[in-house]
Amino acid sequence: MFELILSGFAAVFADPMSIAMVFLGVMVGIIFGALPGLTVVAGLSMFLPVTYVMASNVGLSMLTAIYIGGTSGGLISAILLNIPGTPASIATTFEGAPMAKKGLAGKALGLGVFASLIGTLVGVIVMTLLSPTLAILTLKFGPWEYFSVTFFALTLISALTGKSIVKGLLSALFGMMFATIGLSPIDSAKRYTFGSLQLTSGFHLLVVLVGLYAISEVFSTASAKQQPVKVLSYKMKGLGFTLHDLKGNWGNLLRSSLVGLGIGILPGIGGSTSNIIAYSVAKNSSKHPEKFGTGIPDGIIASESSNNASIGGAMIPLLTLGIPGDGATAILLGGFMLHGMVPGPLLFQQNGDLVYNIFGSMMLGTIFMAVLMWAGMRMFVQILKVPTHILVPLIVVLCSIGAYALGNRVFDMWGLLLFGVIGLMMSR
């Protein structure tokens, strides 16, 4: 196994295109994570069509890099705007914003990046070591086990529906109905085409994903009342912190990373929950819980290490069982399918080289994330000031180009609009 892991890492570091796309993916992810309203899921959805023309290893490496960068990028707006860039950074605002108001924004940002680095490393390392072992176990699955896994995946709808299970089940029903449009895979019989030649091909998976996640987010952002962005000033020298700032927090760092990893493995939860739980655990374990909420490093370290560790955790059920751990891995599932692969028990057997290549690219993406965040913090902070009326049209145009490029059909662009409206209605 270790030989395969090393070969996968070597393949990534020896491929300039993979390195370039991982670098670009991390940068894109940080930008989407930092901008409130444009989540990592929207970023993945938007760039999923871009990977269509890439080699499988390069395209999937770019998507995982966006995942890593987007999860970490949320800390920037959480600290400087007191607005979490992603749901996974909610707990970061509890301590980050008070520290920024004290004039310690640079230290808060530096500690957040360091915690993100350690958390992601823990998650990726455990994923790399644990996934192949679980894959060997899942290869022994028979019909009963496959049925159980499929049934379990369907029951996850109840965990992902928020307060209304009925709405979630109806959404699943509509999803399955849309999936039946087109030609039957068994006898090529036309289903629900209503005489339309365009509907014969059905709705492309990418059109559905980009519409539901990216276009709907754009509509939501555009329809919301925009307030002038006030970014708190900050000074950040070097890494932004010293080893003395980590005194007494090494245990918190490791514990929170493990909390995020464990919660990430549980499908349907992910970083949006792990950061809150890790923050609560850190507060209850602290000798001075009354200081939490006043602006101390402990809360930032707990939140950012846990939400980034959940990345590796969420990837484990995706790769070994084909069950996405959160919304971002659901998009990655679409990425695998786009490139002709189905995550699950046979993935390691049929595409083992690619999987280990992804492991290597995620490790490289983790390093790029830390370097870019520390070195390019000033640039990312300036991006927070970009007006919404510039961002929204740009994103719509890029998404439309990606949808049209799939099959050179204007119909796919109309499908993008349709599912964007559906996604907006579902979010309301």
Feature locations, PLM:
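Membrane-embedded alpha-helical modules
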Residues: 110-223, 338-428
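Flexible loop linkers connecting adjacent transmembrane helices
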Residues: 46, 80-107, 133, 234, ...
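Re-entrant/interfacial helical elements at transmembrane boundaries that shape
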Residues: 40-50, 63, 78-98, 129, ...
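Membrane-interface alpha-helices at helix entry/exit sites of multi-pass transporters
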Residues: 57-61, 98-115, 286-300, 323, ...
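A structural-propensity feature for long, helix-poor, extended segments
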Residues: 67-78, 296-321, 325, 343-372
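Transmembrane alpha-helix interface/packing and boundary motifs in multi-pass membrane proteins
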Residues: 26-40, 70-82, 157-162, 258-269, ...
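Short helix-coil transition sites and intra-membrane helix breaks within transmembrane domains
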Residues: 31-41, 79-90, 122-126, 263-272, ...
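Helix-loop-helix hairpins and the membrane-proximal interhelical loops
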Residues: 1-57, 132, 190-296, 381-382, ...
